[in-house]
Regions:
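Patatin-like phospholipase
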Residues: 1-37, 47-299
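Gly/Ala-rich beta-loop-alpha elbow adjacent to hydrolase catalytic centers
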Residues: 38, 42
């Protein structure tokens, strides 16, 4: 089976993705994961999967241990917290076994650019990653990428499914089509069907569902990080059991995905999230995206 994974941005909430992905790997061989994409802080998750650094990523989340948004803002802007985390996590000696894509936002036009990395770590990547994880309200000035101002990719594509579906023939390690895409996001009312028409089975999940959709965007307290990882791990085990307990046809996989979607639909519609606010900017970014020239290979 050929699988693609999509990790949305979500600041501290991306800790949910750690637990869910660890559970998923109990049922899926990592070699079957052919592509990953991540936006904003979701890039950390995608990179951790591709480079086998989930333990290091969990340590980074727990070492922050800040619950107050203003204190977090001070530590990022004044003390360089995010810069230090990136410098220690994205490092020489890393090797990516899964092609990874992430978006940046060209500013002030708000158009989208996607960058692909794979293989041995190249220090050249860091400036692109810094631009892609560059919250305007937290990190200060935009970065300059290819002679253009660039900011956090979550502004234009916080759930980067597009490059996984559209560019797989060029960037994936397999020439076969994907058999399944799993999207891990934090917007309960998200529905990829409104934007994409595809025959590939797609499971989109709000990974905070098993924790009553609890979303404290700026809470990096150690106890809360532990809670997010633990509840999403349980959720991941439950869904993986439903998806992969039987090795059968793609049609049956689609049927089980639809069953999961319908079983969660009503509960998801009763909840909202600040992540929904990004959909306004994401709509603009996608409208301004140049499909013929929005991807760049960095490996």
């Amino acid at each position: 089976m050929n699988i693609g994974l999509v990790f949305s941005g979500g600041i501290s909430k991306c800790a949910y993705q750690i637990g869910f992905t660890r559970a998923l790997l109990k049922y899926v061989d990592k070699k079957d994961i052919k592509a990953v994409s991540g936006s904003s802080m979701g890039i950390f998750t995608a990179y951790a999967l591709s480079s086998n650094k989930f333990d290091e990523l969990e340590d980074i989340y727990k070492s922050i241990n800040i619950a107050n948004p203003m204190r977090l803002f001070f530590n990022v802007r004044v003390k360089g917290l995010l810069t230090r985390a990136m410098n220690s996590f994205f490092a020489l000696g890393d090797s990516l076994s899964i092609p990874l894509c992430f978006p940046t936002t060209n500013f002030p036009i708000l158009s989208t650019k996607y960058f692909w990395i794979n293989g041995e770590y190249n220090p050249f990547w860091k400036k692109y990653i810094r631009a892609a994880i560059n919250f305007p309200f937290l990190c200060g000035m935009p970065k300059i990428i290819d002679h253009k101002f660039a900011i956090d990719g979550g502004a234009v594509d916080n759930i980067p499914l597009y490059p996984i579906l559209k560019m797989q023939d060029e960037y994936l390690t397999t020439k076969e089509n994907l058999d399944l895409v799993i999207i891990m996001h934090f917007y309960p009312r998200y529905n990829y069907r409104k934007e994409f028409k595809t025959n590939i089975p797609i499971l989109d999940i709000d990974v905070s569902l098993n924790n009553n959709f609890k979303k404290r965007h700026f809470d990096f307290s150690r106890d809360y990080v532990d809670e997010m990882i633990a509840t999403s791990y349980e959720y991941g085990i439950s869904l993986s059991e439903k998806l992969f307990s039987k090795k059968d046809s793609k049609d049956n996989l689609t049927e089980r995905i639809n069953e999961i979607f319908l079983s969660e639909y009503n509960e998801r519609q009763w909840h909202d999230s600040a992540d929904g606010f990004l959909t306004v900017f994401n709509t603009i970014g996608k409208a301004l995206r140049n499909d013929s020239d929005c991807n760049k290979r960095l490996f």
